[in-house]
Amino acid sequence: MKKNNGSKLKIIPLGGLEQIGMNITVFEYEDSIIVVDCGLAFPEDDMLGIDLVIPDVTYLKENIDKVKGFVITHGHEDHIGALPYILKEVNVPVYATKLTIGLIENKLKEHNLLRTTKRKIIKHGQSINLGAFRIEFIKTNHSIADAAALAIYSPAGIIVHTGDFKVDYTPVFGDVIDLQRFAEIGKKGVLALMCDSTNAERPGFTMSERTVGKTIDGLFAEHQNSRIIIATFASNVDRVQQIINSAYKYGRKVVIEGRSMVNIISIAQELGYINIPENTLIDVEQMKNYTGEQLVLITTGSQGESMAALSRMAAHLHKKISILPGDTVIFSSHPIPGNEKAVSNVINELSAPVSYTHLRAHETGRN
């Protein structure tokens, strides 16, 4: 994309196109580069011995003097997971919203990068200047709180990067997507739109997250005489909030199990993105003081990950929790494309009734 003076705006995807995961896109104008997102992907079945897949950032290393920063749209692994690895080679500031920065800082701490990495919290509606670019953060909704779209102003024109999004007029936490701002930017004239297309080929529309909350509540009412185990994405803080709400309503204690689940819920609670009523949360060790119908376990493993808590429970490898006769297991997420077999394997190992409740996290096409 050329400006009249001959300078070019380059948009270089280093991952995330025509694949699930590893989202990272480079925007370059003259001597300025910004990088939107820095995610990882999970290995395919034939990638034996590989735990994670991270993007090839040779281009960034070769042009390190131009790189002004990473701008992150939200806190899912496929958008932030590669940061601790890439920052060791491309050490530039990171800009994101409050919860996203909190999740990033947790990763940086694990990799001893907190002191060497500059971070800045950006609010929705706020703009930052990085070299030739001005980047505006726009409020969107997604299956994780604090998601943002980006309006990237360059000398060549405006690029709108939606990030992952859905339109939810009744979100569990925070404001609705700022469609008015999208309209205002559209009137200015947009050079390019880079839009989330996951599920776009499906007819209909994505329901509000609160719809799943009603379904969860119904399952709690239906299974009042059994222990409930719910597997979901650790990052879906709104979903966890609704599970906790139902647990509190039906007088159940909540156990959070799985390392990533414990970490994310702790961060979200500390930053005010989740509200847990007093005396609702208990440790695994305290479970012995309650009967099954007094408990609900929120766990990782909704994607069939072999080392996740639910997978270890199903295989009788978990040190503290086993699936018991009479338990009800709820999968509150949809398998990511490619994970269907792993999820099926876990379900086959469960000796408990299984229920499904999920909601597409991305906007769909409309009739």
Segments predicted by a language model, with ranges:
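His/Asp/Glu-rich metal-coordinating catalytic cores
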Residues: K2-V71, H76-N289, A308-S322, G338-N345
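Catalytic metal-binding core of the metallo-beta-lactamase
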Residues: L295-S355, L359
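Single conserved hydrophobic/aromatic residue that forms the stacking wall/gate
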Residues: H358-N367
